[in-house]
Structures are given as structure tokens and as C-alpha cells.
Amino acid sequence: MLKNLRETMRTAPIVRRGTYNYFIHPISDGVPVVKPELLREVIACMVKNADLDVDKIVTIEAMGLPLGAALSTMTDIPFIIIRKRKYELPGEIAVHQTTGYSRGELYLNGINKGDRVLIIDDVISTGGTMKAVIKALEKAGAVIKDIVVVIERGDGKKSIEELGYDVQTLIKIDVDENGVKILGCIDEECQ
């Protein structure tokens, strides 16, 4: 099922910043080009595996945007974007995030107490952003029904599971100076 995702991961360029090897991929970076067949494949896999008995889909700016829009369109479930910009709307919740490579503020709007939500994102690595999102949703009184992330790298998934939440990832990778190594896939057809 994830043929395009696997192939584009295997051929993803690597950029070294300090001691960290970054992979550059259409799903996580929007470059070189996000092909519709890749996005369609990823969203079809999400539809197949996610708990869609929810009121809202929650995603994170920036690369969660195409995922959220596509999944919302496919399922008719409205989506909310956790933004990097403060709007100062009533009920806005600041999300304090710290990752392995950055820290900052994100802002949550449009969640009501009791909303059942599905969180989706492009990548989980340290888990810092996802932890902050979960805490903000809990503070708002939302019920987190499922968490689905396209790409898993590092130990971030474990840190979220320690909070009592399962995280489904479509593909698990490791990255070094030689490239991306695929460690597993949700569809078991990784080779």
C-alpha cells in the first residue's frame, strides 16, 4: 500500500546540520514536489487505519496542513490547525513546545470541551511537539481518540506512549549520512 512513500523515503536527500542528519522529503518538507499519488496513498492509509469516530481532526502547522486538508476532504471531518501565529481569540490556548532542535509557541483554537479528536502529523522524532499538543488538548477538555503520524524517527513515539496514548505511524525510519533506512511500515510490506 505504501509503495510511493517507501520509494521516496529511500531516495530522500540527507542534509547534515551540526551532528544531526536531516532527511528532506515531500511529506515532511514539501520539497522537491508533493506528488498527488504520494499524498493520496498516505491519506488512504490513514483512512484505513485511524479511528475516524471523531468530531475534529487536529494537525500542526506547517506540514500537517496538506495532510489535514486531504484527510478532512476524504472523511468530511472538519480539521483544526495548531498555528505558529497568535490570534488572541477567546479560548485560544498557547502550546509551549520544545523539540530536540527548537522551541517556541504554537496556538490552539476551535476545540470545545468533550470534542473527540484525531491528531495527525507528518513526523515524530523527539515527541516534544506532540507532548505539547496533547497537553493543550487535555487542557481544553478534548478527548484524544487516536494519533496517527506518517513518519517515525527516533524515540518520540515511546515518550507519547508513556503518557498513555498509542501512536500509529505509517513508516519507521533511521537516518545517517548514507541515507534513510526503513525499519518498518504499518502495512508490513516494507521491503
Curated annotation (Swiss-Prot):
One of its GO terms (cellular component) is cytoplasm. Pathway: Purine metabolism; IMP biosynthesis via salvage pathway; IMP from hypoxanthine: step 1/1. PROSITE patterns: PUR_PYR_PR_TRANSFER. Its EC number is 2.4.2.8. SUPFAM superfamilies: PRTase-like (SSF53271). InterPro entries: HGPRTase-like (IPR026597), PRibTrfase_dom (IPR000836), PRTase-like (IPR029057), Pur/Pyrimidine_PRTase (IPR050118). GO terms for molecular function: guanine phosphoribosyltransferase activity; hypoxanthine phosphoribosyltransferase activity. It comes from the Archaea. PANTHER family: HYPOXANTHINE/GUANINE PHOSPHORIBOSYLTRANSFERASE, XANTHINE PHOSPHORIBOSYLTRANSFERASE. Belongs to the purine/pyrimidine phosphoribosyltransferase family. Archaeal HPRT subfamily. This is Hypoxanthine/guanine phosphoribosyltransferase. The lineage of its organism: Archaea, Methanobacteriati, Methanobacteriota, Stenosarchaea group, Methanomicrobia. The gene is hpt.
